[in-house]
Swiss-Prot record:
Keyword Oxidoreductase found: yes
Function: Catalyzes the two-electron reduction of the C2 and C3(1) diene system of 15,16-dihydrobiliverdin.
Entry keyword NAD: no
Lineage of the organism: Bacteria, Bacillati, Cyanobacteriota, Cyanophyceae, Synechococcales
A molecular-function term among this protein's GO annotations: phycoerythrobilin:ferredoxin oxidoreductase activity
A matching Pfam family: Fe_bilin_red
Protein name: Phycoerythrobilin:ferredoxin oxidoreductase
Organism of this sequence: Synechococcus sp. (strain CC9311)
Length: 257
């Protein structure tokens, strides 16, 4: 049964979607922030299609949960459920440039080949110590504790390195009981601890002056432009929903700065 969603903060409930508990954790953590719906066009609130073969069709649901607050320009969750073909939660907090904050990024992906899982507080301007030092001093001890409990996901491309912090937690896990156990015992609490730190940083953040805000905005645009150009979900979403819908979704919802 399809539940009609009329605005971006209406609940996302997708039967069998594996990342539902993570989204519920995240929304609960935002509960005290007096958030309001972020404007998302109706056609991107929830879409259903089919993939697979004619003899073995697979139902696909892609939904968007999104809000905004005084300090967060956009908080959004891209949720994809496609049975054994894919299960995805991409949860991102885009701060307002009037506050000196990194991005929060949680990318949780299950494919037929395994789980690809990444968490970070991503810098808008990695070379700016005022922007990064106080974040990394608190993030790295958290990263080191969880990193030791997960296999390393492998190197990231050199061109992407300006957009990741030293606390980038990145792992690949196998399908099955071993991976599922690590997701519940390590990845989920790590996700919540990264998010808790981010919200603490936001709570103490104070407005910056106009010059600093413009500087941060330039860095944020470089980040969102890079993410829009290199979005690894582009191929999957195009296969599920077509090129026109996918490009519009990437540029007008996911990375709309």
């Amino acid at each position: 049964m399809t539940i009609q969603r009329l605005k971006s903060t209406d609940p996302v409930s997708i039967e069998g979607w594996s990342w539902q508990p993570f989204l519920e954790d995240a929304i609960k953590s935002l509960g005290g922030l007096n958030f309001e719906p972020y404007p998302v066009p109706d056609r991107f609130l929830q879409r259903e299609d089919q993939t697979g073969s004619k003899s073995k069709p697979i139902s696909v649901t892609t939904a968007t949960w999104a809000c905004k607050t005084e300090k967060f320009r956009q908080v959004r969750a891209a949720c994809v459920s496609a049975g054994s073909a894919a299960s995805v939660l991409n949860f991102v907090i885009n701060p307002n440039s009037t506050y000196d904050l990194p991005f929060f990024g949680g990318d949780l992906v299950t494919l037929p080949s395994g789980h690809l899982l990444a968490l970070d507080l991503q810098p808008a301007i990695k070379t700016d110590e005022v922007h990064t030092t106080h974040v990394w001093d608190q993030l790295i001890p958290i990263f080191e504790r969880w990193r030791d409990q997960l296999p390393y996901g492998g190197p990231i491309p050199e061109e992407a390195q300006p957009f990741f912090s030293p606390g980038f937690l990145w792992t690949r896990l196998p399908l099955g009981e071993e991976g599922d156990d690590l997701i519940q015992s390590v990845v989920r609490p790590a996700f919540n601890e990264y998010l808790e730190l981010y919200l603490q940083l936001a709570a103490s953040a104070e407005r910056v002056n106009a010059e600093r805000s413009d500087f941060l905005l330039q860095g944020q645009r470089k980040y969102t432009d890079y993410r829009a150009e290199k979005d690894p979900a582009r191929g999957m979403l195009t296969r599920f929903h077509g090129s026109e819908w996918t490009e519009a979704y990437i540029h007008t919802v996911l990375f709309d700065l």
